[in-house]
Structure formats: C-alpha cells, structure tokens
C-alpha cells in the first residue's frame, strides 16, 4: 500500500463505510506523501470531522481552499468545523461563500444562517 492512490482509495472506502478513525490513518499517510492533492486532504478532513478533531479537520479544509478557493464543499466543511469549535463569527464567511457558490443547497443556507444568528447572540457567561 505504498501508492498514494491506493492509500486514498482505501481511506475513502473506510470513510464511506463509516470507519472514520480507521480511514484517517491511510488518508494521513497519503496526505503526507502528496500534500498538494486536494481530494486526499478533503477526504482526510471529512474523516477528522467525524471523529471530532475539528481543528485538524479545519486545517485540511483550509489547505483545500488555498488550492481551490471556489470549492464550495471545503468552504462549507471549514465553516462547520469552526461552528463545532464555537467560533460562529469566524464560520460566517466560509459558510456565506459556500451558500453563494451553491444557492440551491438548502443545508448551506441553514448553517450559514445559524452561524449568523449565533455570532450576533453569543452565549451568556
């Protein structure tokens, strides 16, 4: 399993089967060997999100966005990571961009609106 594609394929198979922890292993190896592959980094970000490693997942989605700034899914996922970390004000921008890029995606609009509302009304301390 030395080939990046084989590691990516194995990781995505595990990811699709719901084995998120296991998927992160070959996907991280593939990322280390081919850090410029946005498909690998997006899949790794998804796996990390599912295992609640939101900061690391956000880093992967940022790397995708650096190379593909109009990747609506990566923008959406970055926004969701930021929301899960309680950073609703920071989540507004990527979620708004994702919703603009794909206006037919209701889920993008729902999470964009939630981030806006939470950022405007922070929890009481």
Regions found by a protein language model. Name each.
Residues 16-17, 50, 84, 117-121:
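Register position in tetratricopeptide repeats
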């Amino acid at each position: 399993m030395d080939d990046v594609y084989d590691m990516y394929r194995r990781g995505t198979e595990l990811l699709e089967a719901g084995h998120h922890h296991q998927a992160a292993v070959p996907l991280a190896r593939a990322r280390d060997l081919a850090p410029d592959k946005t498909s690998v980094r997006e899949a790794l970000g998804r796996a990390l999100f599912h295992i609640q490693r939101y900061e690391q997942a956000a880093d992967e989605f940022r790397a995708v966005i650096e190379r593909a700034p109009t990747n609506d899914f990566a923008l959406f996922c970055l926004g969701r990571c930021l929301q899960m970390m309680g950073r609703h004000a920071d989540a507004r921008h990527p979620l708004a961009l994702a919703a603009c890029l794909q206006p037919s995606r209701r889920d993008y609009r729902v999470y964009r609106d939630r981030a806006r509302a939470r950022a405007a009304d922070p929890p009481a301390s």
